[in-house]
Design a protein with these regions (language model features):
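Aromatic-lined carbohydrate-binding/catalytic grooves of carbohydrate-active enzymes
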Residues: 15-51
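Aromatic- and acidic-residue-enriched segments that line the glycan-binding/catalytic groove
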Residues: 32-44, 78-106, 143-160
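Active-site-adjacent "subsite" loops/lids of carbohydrate-active enzymes
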Residues: 1, 61, 71-72, 77-132
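Active-site and adjacent substrate-binding regions of carbohydrate-active enzymes
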Residues: 121-138, 146-147, 154-163, 173, ...
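Catalytic domains of carbohydrate-active enzymes, especially glycoside hydrolases
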Residues: 3-30, 132-137
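Aromatic-lined carbohydrate-recognition surfaces of secreted/lumenal glycan-active proteins
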Residues: 60, 64, 69-81, 139-142, ...
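Aromatic- and glycine-enriched glycan-recognition loops and surfaces
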Residues: 2-15, 42-66, 167-175
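The substrate-binding groove and active-site-proximal loops of carbohydrate-active enzymes
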Residues: 1, 37-52, 105-120, 158-168
Length: 196
């Protein structure tokens, strides 16, 4: 993995790229050493298994050596994109420990954006990254309710539910922004919006 990352960074540097977006939270897990989230299954094939090195620390060191910035890229809500059995998750995964924090949609599991405990978990995750790593930025992707997540009564004539959902997302984004700025005010924070 390290050799592959170095090759990618060298190619990016040679093409004039100055900032790398590195996915650090694909499924409520971590591509970095975390006391909050388990190791990502993307590293070893088994969620919770230590890969023997810290990919985020490695990429930051290698990118900074090349004069490149690194933004940690997170999917805040996605837990499982295919399947709904929390028992397949690592025993220290918050979703397995507390399935009441989840919503099911399209055969996958997501943290429920309505819940303050979810907002706190996401904010704590970002705070851990910003505190422990010389990161240049944090970027969110898929920071919304699943597109076709059903409305409580099937429709929302007055937009009350849609407005409440937007407000929950706004609250989470503001909480994360405040967390970042309270730790390292210079770290950038961005969101990759999805066109609807």
């Amino acid at each position: 993995q390290k050799k592959e990352l170095i090759k990618i960074l060298d190619t990016l540097k040679d093409t004039g790229i100055n900032t790398v977006m590195f996915q650090v939270r694909p499924y409520g897990d971590a591509m970095y050493k975390s006391s909050i989230n388990p190791w990502s299954k993307e590293l070893t094939g088994t969620q919770g298994k230590d890969p023997g090195y810290d990919p985020l620390a490695f990429i930051i060191q290698e990118a900074h050596t090349r004069g490149m910035k690194v933004h940690a890229w997170l999917n805040p809500y996605r837990v499982v994109s295919s399947g709904t059995d929390v028992n397949v998750l690592s025993s220290n995964h918050l979703a397995r420990q507390n399935p009441s924090l989840l919503i099911e949609n399209r055969g996958g599991l997501y943290y429920n954006p309505d819940l303050q405990e979810v907002k706190d978990h996401i904010s704590n995750t970002v705070g851990e990254i910003v505190s422990n790593y010389d990161i240049d930025g944090i970027t969110f992707d898929d920071y919304f309710y699943p597109t076709d997540y059903p409305l409580p009564q099937g429709e929302d004539k007055d937009g009350v539910v849609a407005n409440a959902r937007r407000e929950h997302i706004n609250q989470m984004i503001l909480q994360v922004k405040n967390t970042i700025k309270s730790i390292k005010p210079w770290v950038r924070f961005g969101v990759s919006p999805r066109g609807v």
